[in-house]
């Protein structure tokens, strides 16, 4: 039961945090990002927010710094929007799974091209 509540709260937080970052946070360091997942602890007191950042390493670093600075403000707005007994502490984490997936796809594509090339030669 607790796990289900944590999962539901995570989905709600994902939606609300995405909206807050898009519409409310005005920090110029925060670039184009996507909230990919939110993991809420079973006691509902902590939330890890995973974000994917579009851009180079410098832009990613600046975006993560901007998010860290805006964490208190984001948490305050979450407290106003989401009716829970305790507003979870928010911790932002960079999610590189999209980049990792793109890299794997690129490698698979390269292997396939090499196999086709070998078949044509042989």
Swiss-Prot record:
Chief location bin: cytoplasm
GO cellular component: cytosol
GO molecular function: ribosomal small subunit binding
One of the protein's GO biological processes: maturation of SSU-rRNA
Pfam families per the UniProt record, alphabetical: RBFA
Highest taxon of the lineage: Bacteria
Keyword annotations of the record: Cytoplasm, Ribosome biogenesis
Location in the cell: Cytoplasm
Function: One of several proteins that assist in the late maturation steps of the functional core of the 30S ribosomal subunit. Associates with free 30S ribosomal subunits (but not with 30S subunits that are part of 70S ribosomes or polysomes). Required for efficient processing of 16S rRNA. May interact with the 5'-terminal helix region of 16S rRNA.
Subunit field text: Monomer. Binds 30S ribosomal subunits, but not 50S ribosomal subunits or 70S ribosomes.
Family from the record: Belongs to the RbfA family.
Protein's UniProt name: Ribosome-binding factor A
Origin species: Halothermothrix orenii (strain H 168 / OCM 544 / DSM 9562)
């Amino acid at each position: 039961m607790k796990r289900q509540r944590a999962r539901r709260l995570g989905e709600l937080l994902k939606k609300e945090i995405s909206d807050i970052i898009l519409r409310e946070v005005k920090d110029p360091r925060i670039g184009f990002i996507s909230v990919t997942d939110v993991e809420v602890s079973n006691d509902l007191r902590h939330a890890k927010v995973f974000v994917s950042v579009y851009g180079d390493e410098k832009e990613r670093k600046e975006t993560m710094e901007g998010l860290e600075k805006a964490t208190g403000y984001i948490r305050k707005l979450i407290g106003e929007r989401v009716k829970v007994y305790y507003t979870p502490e928010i911790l932002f984490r960079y999610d590189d799974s999209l980049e990792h997936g793109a890299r794997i796809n690129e490698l698979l594509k390269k292997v396939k091209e090499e196999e086709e090339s070998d078949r044509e030669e042989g």
